[in-house]
Each structure stands twice: as C-alpha cells, then as structure tokens.
Design a protein with these regions (language model features):
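Nucleotidyltransferase catalytic core that binds NTPs
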Residues: 1-215
Length: 215
C-alpha cells in the first residue's frame, strides 16, 4: 500500500535526532515517504519559541536532498490549534487507500490518552512508536489494553492494511533535545554538529533563539 510515515512536531529547532529517527524508520519499515509536518499552534505543548514559518523553513532545509523526505505545511497555515486527529482526517481524505503511519516518540505515546479524540487516531492511521532500546511498553491501563488489542510485530501489517495497528520500534537515541539546543544557543554557544549546517546558518542569521528569546 506504499505506506506514508507522518512525522509531526514543533521542530523548535529540528536537529539530527529527529532526522536520524526518521531515516531509521524509513529504512526499517520500508516507508516510501516520510512526511514532516511542523506544528503551527500545538495544543498539547508550550508555544514554540521560533515563528512557525521559520520552523517550516528549518525543516525544509534539513530534509532537502534526502530521498523520500517531504514537508507538509498545512498545520503552519492553520489559524487555530493543530490537532493530530484533524490532520490525519485530512490526509485520509486525500489518500483513502494508502497506509498512513503516524510516528511518535515514547513520551508522546505515554501521554496519548491526553490527546484530543485520541481513540480515533487508529481509525485513521497506524501508530509507529520510536523508543529507546530496552524500554518496556506499558502492560496495564488504557495503553496496555490498546497494545494487547492493536499491537503488532509484523512490518507487513503496516503495508497490508490502511490503519489500526501499533508497531513499536527501537531507534538509535542521540542525546539531543530541542530545549537543550535552544539553551545552548541562548548562551551564545555554537550548535554546529547538532543539526544540518543550513539550519544552523538560518538560526544564527535570524537570532531566533538569542538569549533575550529564551529567558
């Protein structure tokens, strides 16, 4: 079914840990496309520091030239909150017969019951959970029950059905976080080797994470 990986986030800023996770999942799960969706107004997180259009530009620069990496600006263009269920509904309408795989990290998965209309997500897409090696999935509560009901260890299920499965995959964990990158830049330090050079240059040229913006 030519699965599409959907990788949303604030990307404030995007860095090599994001890109490595996307690349490993693309290779391991045989995803023809990883679509990055920078959030415009994320309802479940603190407001981003950098402007939405600037973060979009960062993602475009970071993914340029990588086969199968694409960027979708629909959430940036929205005036209101960017709910994942709404974005997936739009994508499902556009790709009625395609397998959609929503990529989330471990922390996001554990907070899933707090998401808007979270039980509807699996009606629209598969859920791919990227986690640290050695992490154990919850065995109790709503997420434990959901994993018993919807969990799969078969990559083929992501290709043979449009939605409804949860697949958990261990990825290399680079110890980089957007918060730490912003703090480092705010202290006047160089973020070289934490992100692609084109993203670094844009950040330094715009001073979007200068000390006055992070305190």
């Amino acid at each position: 079914m030519n699965p599409m990986g959907i990788f949303g986030g604030t990307f404030d800023p995007i860095h090599y840990a994001h890109l490595r996770t996307a690349f490993e999942l693309q290779q391991a799960l045989r995803l023809k496309e990883i679509r990055f969706l920078p959030a415009g107004n994320p309802p479940h997180r603190d407001q981003p520091i950098a402007d939405a259009h600037l973060r979009l530009q960062m993602v475009q620069l970071a993914t340029a030239g990588q086969a199968g990496f694409t960027v979708d600006d629909r959430e940036v263009r929205k005036a209101g909150p960017s709910y994942s269920v709404d974005t997936l509904s739009e994508l499902r309408h556009e790709y009625p017969d395609r397998s959609l795989c929503l990529i989330v990290g471990m922390d996001a998965f554990l907070s899933l019951p707090k998401w808007h209309q979270w039980r509807e997500l699996l009606q629209l897409a598969h859920l791919v959970v990227a986690h640290r090696p050695g992490w154990r999935a919850p065995g109790m509560g709503p997420l434990g029950e959901l994993l018993v009901d919807r969990g799969t260890g078969r990559i083929g299920d992501l290709h043979e059905t449009r939605a409804g499965c949860i697949y958990i995959h261990a990825v290399t964990q680079l110890e980089i976080s957007s918060t730490e990158v912003r703090q480092l830049i705010g202290m006047g330090r160089d973020p070289r080797f934490l992100m692609p050079d084109a993203v670094r240059k844009l950040i330094l040229d715009t001073n979007c994470y200068s000390k006055t913006r992070t305190t």
